[in-house]
Amino acid sequence: MSKGRAVRLNRETDLLKLVAIVAMFIDHLGAVLFPGVREMRIIGRIAFPIFCYTLAAGCCYTRSMAAYSVRLLIAALISQPFYAVGLNHVNSYMRELTFANPLLDSVKWYLYSFKTCNIMVALLLGQLVIWTLRERKYLLTALLAFFILFLDSHGWIASSYGLKGILLMVLFWALIDRPLASFVWVGGYMFAWALEGRGYDYFGITFGIQLFAMAALPLIYIPLDRHFRMPKSVFYLFYPLHLLLIYFLNTMI
């Protein structure tokens, strides 16, 4: 596989990130504050495929995969406590802590919170897999795959779509220079994923809510020429801050 892949899908990745950020915010507001408003969760389904695609495109554009990994790692570590409290992912291990030793129990609370990882962890794992494939380090790819399978089997990356989500990132990257093949394979993969769920019946077929994630595909595959630019820091800062905002809103309502 060539390192220098030409991105032949939508190159307006900053604009796509902005769309995904807004959709994610609506989704998370719906999950925590308006659980009965199903439409908010439906809107939010477009966010993850877009993040997967922009991650794949970023792996083609970046000058340093190592620096890219470090940014994602730092974002994942910083965002985790905000994710845990913002989206109510406080597990039984965390609740049992008495904080008799504030420092030690705070460290334990933080480590226990990774029983449910934030999306930055999934993006980091996807980026690392793509990096090993790009460099043809297939032994490292295999080791990473086993590690991801372990995390997925224990539910630690389930909230970030688990193994399926990481495979979607790799699929976007592998076919990013072949639009038609990418559309067929990615569309088919996402459709099959939607068939695994329940709750929506169309044309005699039962789908899960992931069916609505396919609404992201036109945004990804139709080229735009807007030249919209957004600082890299916006997404990395917005992610933990919007979770903190949701936490405060939830405590006030």
Say what each PLM segment does.
Residues 1-253:
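Alpha-helical transmembrane segments and their immediate juxtamembrane cytosolic regions
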